[in-house]
Regions:
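Well-ordered beta-sheet/strand-loop patches within structured domains
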Residues: 1-172
Length: 172
């Protein structure tokens, strides 16, 4: 049900690719965090390492600066509910270091909202939005070439708004 602006249903793809690109040490020229924290992105990862896309205004963009081809292979596992990206290319000796995201400015989710819905049978309760606390996260990434020269030195800051749970309550 969430409608705010940024997003559009393919963000699992963009978030997973963003993480692969970070770990490959490639320059990222455009990335946008979600408007609010998405819990399932934080199940195996700290908050703040996500990317949203929404055509035509919000995109994830990166540059292949290796001087060689890169093959991007995706694999979806329905059994494990997992999406994996593997980037193949000629190694150029770059090294990548990233700090663990720091969470600041934590704010709890607002109180849940319950809305009457005459289209649902009386007594039925349907959750259409899920609570998420607000926060600001930041992490740092450094990429060095094979000689130790810094190629990329950047901070990523994500600001997430607190989000309330919304329940429809049947009155029909």
């Amino acid at each position: 049900k969430t409608v705010l602006g940024d997003g559009g249903g393919v963000c699992q793809v963009s978030t997973t690719l963003f993480r692969a690109i970070l770990n490959a040490g490639l320059p990222i020229t455009e990335r946008h965090a979600h408007a609010y924290r998405v819990g399932y992105y934080e199940e195996e990862s700290p908050p703040g390492i996500d990317a949203t896309v929404f055509y035509p205004s919000v995109d994830l963009k990166f540059v292949n600066d290796t001087g060689n081809y890169i093959l991007i292979q995706s694999k979806a596992s329905e059994d494990e509910l997992r999406l994996t990206y593997t980037l193949y290319g000629k190694k150029d000796g770059r090294s990548i270091t990233m700090t663990t995201p720091i969470v600041t400015g934590y704010s709890p989710a607002p109180e849940a909202l319950r809305q009457d819905d005459p289209t649902l049978p009386k007594g039925t309760v349907k959750q259409i939005d899920f609570a998420a606390p607000g926060a600001t996260t930041s992490f740092h990434r450094t990429v060095k070439d094979k000689n130790g020269k810094i190629m990329i030195d950047e901070n990523y800051v994500s600001r997430y708004a607190p989000w309330r749970a919304v329940f429809l309550v049947g009155t029909g």
